[in-house]
Amino acid sequence: MNLKNIAIIMDGNGRWAKKNNLKIKEGHARGVSALKEIVKESVNQNIESLTVYAFSTENWKRPKSEVKAINNLIVNSINNELDELIEQKVKVRFFGDYSNFGKKTYEKIKFAEEKSFSNEPKLRLNVALGYGGKMDIINIAREVSRLKIKASDINDHTINELSQVPESSIDLLIRTGGDTRISNFLLYQIAYSEIHFVRKLWPDYSKQDFKRNINKYFNSERRFGERT
């Protein structure tokens, strides 16, 4: 059984900060450090793509101070981590509606995508920013209408071509933080995913935890609706 595409709902930064008597922005910063470790391990494990939920459409409802801190963290993370990602042959792509973060952040994101572009990356790192699965499906329906695509011509390929999500399917979805819900993430792409819910808060999630999730995946049986 192959494991090519992994997605992670990186939940628990705020609770981790509160537990450690730190500011929320410090929790998010520690979350970036955790992601850095998982990216390295994904390369080591020959994973083809890692798709992470960084900021949802619902997250715009958070306090302005927190959104601003996340905005600054995005820019600083690109400045500090991009060269190392390129050295690891990691291709970075952001998806979702992140225009509200402002021109500076938008331009920094495009710079990161262009500079890390590769036709043969060791890992595709997809970052969901201002993304929601329901809105993605709504936008797909609008595009189908705008392009006047016949109902008989709509298939899985059509949906994947019109979706914002770079990957057509996810093999393994991991959610940290203890909650057992999908939270509007990759609703179409996780149709046959193995889903692992992890109690640890995201900043505490390590490469050892990641390896355990990978091993658990290989010990499962994916039937895709078939009888064995």
Question: What do the predicted segments below correspond to?
Answer:
Residues M1-T228:
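Flexible, compositionally biased loop and terminal segments
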